[in-house]
């Protein structure tokens, strides 16, 4: 930048600013400003032409007055005239005034644009930079329309100076963020990628920021940047601090550029080229190695720069989720930060480990730090760090440590900050249900929750414990005994009274044989709490009382006396009054048989997924990211509520981090009729449709019941299937995106995760399959602040798929607000074996521009695999029966991932087959069996996987009764290793 000459000091401006600062009152300041405005106006209107220096001085004064908060309605033309000056300082002040005061509706905008175009067309790099800075500072749509085509040309021009390229890249980035549709993609996109090889580090830094933003919407246009980014990163990471002296910050070479390059690489999957991938892995290992080296400076700036690169490196390792060694090393490095004296580092380490805990490769490594995390939960002074510690405990929990983690979280709950208590309660409830070893422990845990933090136990939590106790005969007696003892405490939370009233009303007879819990004692205990409770709880207790009359006839007179009391029959609350009147009449006129029929025990609730997960997601809020679990499987976990027995492909640990994606909420438990009118037991409390006794459902009906979406608003809507949306023909949609096959392969061995994500949209999947049926939930998240219009996701059946796979889709809202998400339900039925997955076409308008996206839906033939156990003799007999050449498919291939027996086992289980032990003579080999269920027929499948660790090779052999199925399954499974 040219040096400012001595004459450019503008003494008059300095005097004016000094006068303003010396004013003793607001009135004095306004008086001085008005005097100056009158002077400037007279100068501008005078007959004597002003020179450039005077114009600059007066324009600066106007700008200063405007920044003080006063309106300026003149001087704009003089500022525009300064743009035509050939002196840098005058042109600079003109651009400064334009950037701050002139809006896009100004009458002078055409003159301003002409001046900017003249400067852009000049060969003076200083003037070009001033013009580019002005465009970026204003950043309006009008500026974008005027210059969006010129700036890319300047950026990639061979004769542009480095400073101009740098300014052009940042200017284009500003315009693209403001109006993405105005920046044309063209030949320049390929050339801008090569700026990553530029010798000027400032140009590279600006180019990386631009490419990172552009590639999120147009990844294919910039995919060549991966190899260049890896190459540039490698040169930075491996360089000594003296090699990049001008860009070394406290002994750390180019930290800002390193972080930007690592973020750019997170926009793409791992490189397919082995050489590029090897070089990148070497870079990541180098960063992890440098983190272990002693610091070269004690300055905080050195550690900040070093740690910024390290954490971004760990984020990239987590993003790839394909290098077990790096994931474990990252986990160990983060473990060292857990006890760092810097609070921010401890927070970031806990946050990153939450994500690592959801990876199958690093989950065990994360668990080794459980004691440190528990200590952080107890001793951290910063509430945000304690909250992250609780999140990490939740993420690392599995069957082996569930009791310890739940116990520690309960202990922490007693002293936890009020702001996070409800969230801790929800997490404890979810973990207790998911990893319960026995139901008595689950009941004890929930009752402890109510005792410790009753005010924060939401309805979803205590609804759920009632649901589970009702459905489990083996825990009903224990629950009745435990809740009876809990109610004997002098101070008893109202939620405990609700749970106790319900359970004793249903199962109090199971403990009535003990004199200490005889029927009169049970009634007396409950009624002692009656007058201290809210109307809703008293209504529930009245329903319990009428149940007692049926269970314990000896209490009839006492209870009728309570119902007959004036405080009940003439209660000011109409609900309590009606219940008292109707229950009293029912107990007086109904025979014993009628009373027993009306007040019979509640039938089991329909099995559904817990709504507590959805409650937790809502509590975390949209900024918490995806609450959708990411596919880390825990084969030992079990559904405590008695749904289908989970297989490794359907069980996963929820990730605490999440972005826009949520879990569906189940409706509250339903209640059967207890009497006519308002006398339904708990019907008002649970506010759900009545559960009528019925014959046992078919397996298909039971399965769909377990996968029930959120409760419809009307009871009749429960009977309706999702309305099928219009299915456009394949010719109406574009081809799948280039990475569609790669995205599909991610879901071959898992059912839950993020299917697609770019700058605008995130699509998550949660699915479950049984026999030939499946249900899939698609979550569409709007990542922008702008509403999507005409949003239309549809499923397309290419070729003959319509006759092979039936997919019913439910329409979604045509508008998706910024930051919001919508859910689409798909019911899937496999009619016969198929080779091609259906396509998902997503169309919408964003900012007036049409957007279209076509993906492959993660529905592959192995999703309808049912694992089959068989003895070795049966396996070999069946293997010989499938001996025809067309029934066998075999593939020998190189391992694409580290060969780990546990990982291989998890993938085979996730694929859907059962693993058979002691069948193959070689214990290193894997043998599996299963049946593919279709509506038309069943296809038996046997597989054998032979790893050769020395040669880093696999041999995969599959035999099925249908040739196409053998070949297709072999291809699908081979891609996973």
UniProtKB/Swiss-Prot annotation:
The modification Phosphoserine is found at residues 626, 652, 655. Adaptor protein complex 2 (AP-2) is a heterotetramer composed of two large adaptins (alpha-type subunit AP2A1 or AP2A2 and beta-type subunit AP2B1), a medium adaptin (mu-type subunit AP2M1) and a small adaptin (sigma-type subunit AP2S1). Interacts with SGIP1. Interacts with HIP1 and RAB11FIP2. Interacts with SLC12A5. Interacts with clathrin. Interacts with RFTN1. Interacts with KIAA1107. Interacts with PICALM. Together with AP2B1 and AP2M1, it interacts with ADAM10; this interaction facilitates ADAM10 endocytosis from the plasma membrane during long-term potentiation in hippocampal neurons. InterPro entries: Adaptor_Complx_Large_Subunit, AP2_complex_asu, ARM-like, ARM-type_fold, Clathrin/coatomer_adapt-like_N, Clathrin_a-adaptin_app_sub_C, Clathrin_a/b/g-adaptin_app_Ig, Clathrin_app_Ig-like_sf. It holds the Pfam family Adaptin_N. Residues 615-675 are annotated as: Disordered. It comes from Homo sapiens. This is AP-2 complex subunit alpha-1. Expressed in the brain (at protein level). Isoform A: Expressed in forebrain, skeletal muscle, spinal cord, cerebellum, salivary gland, heart and colon. Isoform B: Widely expressed in tissues and also in breast cancer and in prostate carcinoma cells. The lineage of its organism: Eukaryota, Metazoa, Chordata, Craniata, Vertebrata. It is found in: Cell membrane; Membrane, Coated pit. It is a peripheral membrane protein. Belongs to the adaptor complexes large subunit family. One of its GO terms (biological process) is postsynaptic neurotransmitter receptor internalization.
